[in-house]
Design a protein with these regions (language model features):
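Long, low-complexity regulatory segments enriched in Ser/Thr/Pro/Gly and acidic residues
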Residues: 1-164
Length: 164
């Protein structure tokens, strides 16, 4: 048995577990995590690693996007349906593939091939692919959520500072 290969696969598995655990924290309503980010470790495009998480919603997620590196992440948006005496709150999860124009061609190609595997870990309501943080706006997300939703649409959305 080649232990080097086994250890490499084990490390990749553990790192994917870290991303999966971050996803579970994001979707667990008992904590205040509202976004997660994953990417490649420095100088390696064959592994996915957990990078960061936070509680500041979409604005904080955007502020943590690097200028020139690949990020896969997700954040929570709360759909609020206020119909008089009944208020319903439902979390929606947004998957983001961030691939800035400054990323080298080979790294871009590798990132494109990894999206399917990452989507196996991060299973969100909608997907957004962006090259610039300025492309990620509340209006874009609301439009995609409304297009993906059924007949019963929320009356509004919260992107941070989720009220109870």
């Amino acid at each position: 048995m080649n232990f080097d290969v086994s250890i490499d696969y084990l490390l990749i598995f553990i790192r994917c577990l870290q991303v999966g655990n971050a996803w579970r924290r994001l979707t667990d309503d008992s904590n205040d995590i509202s976004w997660i980010a994953a990417g490649y470790p420095e100088g390696n495009t064959s592994e996915l690693v957990f990078k960061a998480e936070g509680s500041g919603g979409m604005p904080e997620f955007i502020s943590n996007l690097p200028a020139a590196d690949v990020v896969w992440g997700a954040f929570k948006v709360v759909g609020v349906d206020n119909r008089g005496n009944t208020i319903s709150r439902r979390p929606k999860y947004i998957f983001v593939k961030y691939l800035p124009g400054e990323v080298p061609t080979m790294k871009r190609a590798r990132a494109g091939g990894h999206k399917g595997a990452i989507k196996q870990i991060i299973d969100a309501h909608i997907d957004v692919e962006i090259e610039s943080a300025s492309e990620l706006t509340e209006e874009v997300i609301i439009q995609k959520l409304r297009a993906a939703g059924g007949a019963h649409q929320p009356t509004g959305y919260e992107f941070s500072n989720y009220s109870s």
